[in-house]
Amino acid sequence: MYNEKRRKVTSMKIMKRRYERKLREKMKSHKHMTGLLIGLSCLIVVLGGLLLSTRHEASSQLLTPPPAGLSATTAETPLSYSPILTWQTDDEAVMYEIEFFTKKPEHISSSKISSQAVFRTRSVYQNAYNAPLEEFVEADQLGNPNEPVYWRVRALDFNGTPYTPFSELVPLYTSPNLPRMNAPVLTAEYGGPKGETLLYPVYTWIGQANAASYEVDIYAENPEVNPDAAPIETLTTTMAEIYDPEPHYSSEPFYWRVRSFDGEGQPLGDWSEVRSFRTSPDDNWQVAVLGDSISHGGGHYSYSPAVFSFSWLHYLDFPSINLSESGDTSGMTAERFERDVLPFHPAYLIIMTGSNSLRAGEDTDAVIADLESIRQRCLENGIRPILVTLPAIHPANIEHVFDEPTADDWEDRFEAVNAYIRTHTYIDMAMAIPTKDGELPTQYALDGLHPDANGKALMGAYVNSVWPEVKAEADEEMQEYLDAQ
């Protein structure tokens, strides 16, 4: 799911520390304490029921409501023999389980799979599914207005444990007169001001049944307008998403489309529609965010940066462009500065990187040197740098989800780097999410590293609460730098 650029260590031992007590002592004299209190107060309004509905994996004992908004059909409004079925997304779901029935059972449990189901799958990682009905429904039933197929869906956690009941059975009427799904359906859409413009896009779509792989082509001109247009980049994947490893920016839009291939490498239908996105320095972005996957977006294992509820930038009260790249170490972020930041020349650059380096055992002095290098180059180019402290992590959850160990002394490493950050103009993001025993709680970050939607909302609200003060400090620092030249 995330770029595998991270350096690894060879041993793991989770150390329990009383970090909370240390943070409380620091808060007494913390210069952003007022902003923190304001931020916590405003969360009641900003988050409301979001925090109340936070769940641990499968801790709801199936009291959480089942998926809703399932695709509705009637004999008069049928779908094709290869339909796309959808339901309302659930930010707490990692995957979904779907069952199909050729007859409506008289008795069926909402908490257990049914032996009467003719087809069942758990390989559903989004709130949409292209059902291969012709593989498990008799031909004389398909298209029969008096004999619909039935289906239901439930949400599962990372371990495959149900945390919601199955939905009610929904009839699925079909018609031979409707075209089958013949191409992927694109879902990612970029270009908005609320963290919705990414220098490193993630392309996502609804996949076709029986597709073994996908090809994504990116163009500098619309291939539907100019059929001879050649792609500037071609990506391949076996999943219904792919992270672009290359930055894309221009005063003109970019275009992308996807097609499927079967197991023999033959095209499985047609190209998808063409979708465009614009990432332009000409749009005069005043605020940019530079960092790793925590800022790039995504979380809860299945959600990519294309799902903006998993981006803390999406919750900001001001426009910002996302220059972050998943998988970055602090060194990688520093190396990208001239290529990825200077073309946009934002007035303010929010910088949060180093978590991947420190948890892998990188020397703290090296991370601090990378941050200082970025900070100095900002000032030299008339950009106001704003460093961001690193939130806590949860090594056991990182190991469970990513099978990656964490440096034994990660807390000391994070504390040392955060101490450096607090000597400059900074946002104390480490204070944004409440910790438990010094670690990032599972209820805010399933994978122990990337805050989920509720955690990202907390981060955005905290930034909003301190932004006027931090912005003024950044202006003052820039003026002092200019006066000293």
Q: PLM features: what roles do these ranges have?
A:
Residues 394-485:
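Catalytic His-Asp segment of secreted/periplasmic serine-dependent ester chemistry enzymes
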Residues 302-305, 313, 331-370, 392-395:
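Oxyanion-hole/transition-state-stabilizing segment in secreted/luminal serine hydrolases
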Residues 352-356, 377-411:
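Active-site segments of SGNH/GDSL-like serine hydrolases
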Residues 158-177, 263-279:
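Extracellular fibronectin type III
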Residues 100-146, 218-249:
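Recognizes extended acidic, P/S/T-rich segments that occur
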Residues 81-92, 199-210:
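Conserved aromatic anchor
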Residues 266-326, 336-345:
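Serine-esterase "nucleophile elbow" of acetyl-processing enzymes
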